[in-house]
Amino acid sequence: MQKRSVFFISDGTGITAESVGHLLAHFPTVSFKHIRLPFTDSEQKVQEALLKIAETEKADGARPIVVMTLVNTDLRDMLKQSNAVHLDVFGSFVDPLAEELQEQPSRTSGIAHSVLGNSYYERIDAINFTLNHDDGMTDFGLSEAQVILVGVSRCGKTPTSLYLAMQFGIKAANYPLIPEDLERGSLPEALKKYPEKLYGLSINPERLHSVRSERRPDSHYASLDNCRREIRLAEDLMHREGISWIDSTSRSIEELSTIILQKIRVNSNH
């Protein structure tokens, strides 16, 4: 497998640069090493970045990829002196817009987040909420959740919840359907008050067996028979409770989140 190093260089937090970096997922046969250099906002820091890029090129034997979000044109020009593949987010998008609109863009670092006003801080609040309500950790404040993902252990609830919080500012809780719930054939008591917030995830039993075996090999928990049984009982339970659900086996977190987000928006309009 081809291996390449990718630098995410920003004069702010680097969130925008890393968002662009999600496009790397379209090259599944390449292994990318991520190197983050946030707050690169001076000539000295750019010089340090240039040194790291040169060292990485020498070690890898291949040009690094540099995703940059620098608003200062002088610093951008300095960075482009490196022997790398440069993806200049500001130059590629903002500069052509400035020419078309006949307006000078703001050169203030972090403006991409500050213009969002309260929504930026709402996203941070959503992340904290999601971390505090991961895997049924607590039902305190569960009424604030915009969605509660349910499903058997290791079906993708946690990464999907975090993606919803980080990318969309959604307060996403997740709650496991444990063997006791499945045997009883009913939802955990804490969830019964919020049927409209529930959304289920399921998974192919063979895939679940593989994932669980990495964590607890040769256990009843990871056995294929148990995985098949848990999935069957969980899907039966979600069907009885009228919970919409989706199979996560062959879907990316981005795709799962988009589908769930559509449900949240439909519910919020009712």
From Swiss-Prot:
UniProt-recorded Gene Ontology molecular function terms: ADP binding; ATP binding; phosphotransferase activity, phosphate group as acceptor; protein serine/threonine kinase activity
Key words of the record: Kinase, Nucleotide-binding, Serine/threonine-protein kinase, Transferase
Record flagged with keyword Translocase: no
Binding site for ADP: G151, V152, S153, R154, C155, G156, K157, T158
Catalytic activity: [pyruvate, water dikinase] + ADP = [pyruvate, water dikinase]-phosphate + AMP + H(+); [pyruvate, water dikinase]-phosphate + phosphate + H(+) = [pyruvate, water dikinase] + diphosphate
S-S bridge residues: none
Top-level EC class: transferase
Name of a matching Pfam family: Kinase-PPPase
Top-level taxon of the source organism: Bacteria
EC number: 2.7.11.33, 2.7.4.28
Family annotation (InterPro entries): Kinase-pyrophosphorylase, PSRP
Family the entry assigns: Belongs to the pyruvate, phosphate/water dikinase regulatory protein family. PSRP subfamily.
Reported function: Bifunctional serine/threonine kinase and phosphorylase involved in the regulation of the phosphoenolpyruvate synthase (PEPS) by catalyzing its phosphorylation/dephosphorylation.
Record PANTHER family: PYRUVATE, PHOSPHATE DIKINASE REGULATORY PROTEIN 1, CHLOROPLASTIC
Protein name: Putative phosphoenolpyruvate synthase regulatory protein
Organism whose genome encodes this protein: Methylobacillus flagellatus (strain ATCC 51484 / DSM 6875 / VKM B-1610 / KT)
Top-level taxonomy: Bacteria, Pseudomonadati, Pseudomonadota, Betaproteobacteria, Nitrosomonadales
